[in-house]
Amino acid sequence: MQHTTSLRHRVSAARTAAVLAFGTLAVAGAAMAQNYSPELIEKGRYLATASDCIACHTATKTKPMAGGHSISSPVGDIVATNITPSKSHGIGNYSEQQFADALRKGVRADGAQLYPAMPYTAFSLFTNEDVHAMYAYFMEGVKPVDEAPKATTSLPFPMNVRASMIGWNLLFANDKPFEPDPAQTPEWNRGAYLALGAGHCVTCHTPRGAMMQELASKSMSGAQIGAWYAPDITNSKTHGIGSWSVDELTTYLTTGHLPGKSQAAGPMAEAITHSFSQLNETDLRAISTYILSVPSHKPEDPAQRNRFAHGQATDATAGFRGTSFAEGMKQSGTALGAQIFTANCASCHGASGQGTQDSYYPALFGKSITGEANPSNLIAAILNGVDRETPKGGHVFMPPFGDQTNAMVPLKNEEVAALSNFLLTSYGNSAVSVTADQVQVIREGGAKSSLVLLARVGMAVGAVVVLLLLVLLAKKRGRARRR
């Protein structure tokens, strides 16, 4: 009887344990596959759009967020990973905390460090509520793609040691969420939150130091990003965009085009197409309000023209009309540039560089691309062209003249330099000139950082110091033994 009772107790205990275990698994399963509200998922989608995730993490339009896009950096190319909710190749197994750590701290679920090409230094400003919304979107609003990018990140030593980012993060990363400034308006604070966090404007527009860290003392004052130059967007009327109004900046962020001042190309065109143009007007005006309040870090010079005030309509081609193309191409300098312009550019931009009346083909004078002291964007636009979608189904296109398979007329470095100098002399900042060597640097994706070399030298010096210390220690021990 005692044996039977004991057996019953054991069976009952086993059943209870099974029920508890099943309940625990059910709760865990529910945590992994929650049914988020449509409103929360939509909020997350909006924040992901504001963060421009799709621009870097999409190589093929039919597979959004599946990774594979190569990002050019001064230390090498970094390949964006699959961030779809795929459980085999994406982030489908990430918990919300792991997702938050990747987004705000640059730490993957496996503990490996991300490179700051992923702007976690800016995304650290996200609030917990917004991270929660983004997690909901990526888990339930993005279609999983069960394949890995064909290419992977392969940086030179020692940058390929991801653990090296731990020290960098301790020195330069921010780990505090955004704190509103009580002295500012709600609109300004909303704009600051979006511009500094999701929009990560500082990531591109702020120059970097020897360790590739953002120089806070020069925030938004302009920086080289690969082949392109992200210009000064402080409120300086001489160096930045202080001459713009909130309405004008909002228009530019919406369309990528501000007649008489600027036309988006390169990474900024991508940001406008995939991100800014998709935001609501209230947020765009808030961003504009904040950006136009960012102080300049350079002294104002009323006598100096800003980059939007150079050049005028000039028919600089009249002097060689009647000359054959073959003869014209034998010229050098700006004369060669004028021939190239007439043959390849004037049909769209006009013989006087005036563009079209509707500005679909923009004027070449009074624009940042020809007025900027740094000619990188002019060179990059010639080599790479412009190809972007605009709101309401529009399309901006300029053919490339580099070495792409779809280049209309592949131009040599000397020819690109000649064309650039003709454009600068005729329609832009004539104090700026371009060399064939500069063109080659832009053709290769921009100047490379000396950080890799510095790191290797530092490691070599460190190894020598350690070796010397070991030798000295060995000698000291040898003397002690002889005594």
Residue locations for each model-derived region?
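Short, solvent-exposed loop/turn and secondary-structure capping segments
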Residues: 58-59, 64-69, 111-114, 145-152, ...
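Active-site substrate-binding loop specific to GH73 endo-beta-N-acetylglucosaminidase modules
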Residues: 66-76, 207-256
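Axial heme c-ligation environment in periplasmic c-type cytochrome domains
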Residues: 77-93, 104-129, 150-154, 230-241, ...
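Short, low-complexity patches enriched in S/T/P/G
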Residues: 446-457
